């Protein structure tokens, strides 16, 4: 059995802590033989290989009595880069418990559990459902809308350095004025409406006009300004920080992607530039 979970890119500018897309990088968990103790085989640095691994901790939270197994973990989702690496592990852990303990959890229940563990829905929602997901968590009320993402190409610049979510959150202001909040909300409303309508020109402008977080976080990613400037000049719809950063995501017309890719490659930035696509399936279990 293989559990497959996509990477995710959250916020999309003004959709702070509530909007995300699933993209084509993956965590795969292969469940092998039973053992006396848990063994998670992987090649990641500073990640536990025993029951302290987040995958196993999540599974045991739901089903404490499941039998230990040899688990093979494969992932091309980089850690601490704003692509939902921890969310993918949490979602995989929930599915691991669901399969081994035969819990028969609905997708909505998996989403609720993942949101409770993660603390916010913006990454776990697209990791589970795929595509574009807009979600809201207010007290005990959790709602979401899944929608197809408009036609666009994606480029991701993944820096060779980490940016911890805690550091990125520390850069945010403690309060927004009422006037600022109204303006930020109107921008977010337009961004979502344009995405649902398939109007990437208007969506792109709204994404880049975010007032909730990018103004304060851009300085933490030294490449952001030059990437945004070149991408816009070359015809991109929008450039935004993926999640808490430092990954920078570019949305562009299909016919512009190769030109933008080459322009950014010529900058010789310290990181990896990748072409990505929207993942449409979300969480998968392969037998």
Swiss-Prot record:
Signal peptide: none annotated. GO terms for cellular component: cytoplasm. Keywords: Amino-acid biosynthesis, ATP-binding, Cytoplasm, Kinase, Nucleotide-binding, Threonine biosynthesis, Transferase. InterPro entries: GHMP_kinase_C_dom (IPR013750), GHMP_kinase_C_sf (IPR036554), GHMP_kinase_N_dom (IPR006204), GHMP_knse_ATP-bd_CS (IPR006203), Homoserine_kinase (IPR000870), Ribosomal_Su5_D2-typ_SF (IPR020568), Ribsml_uS5_D2-typ_fold_subgr (IPR014721). ATP binds at residues 78-88. SUPFAM superfamilies: GHMP Kinase, C-terminal domain, Ribosomal protein S5 domain 2-like. Catalyzes the ATP-dependent phosphorylation of L-homoserine to L-homoserine phosphate. This is Homoserine kinase. It comes from Streptococcus uberis (strain ATCC BAA-854 / 0140J). The gene is thrB.
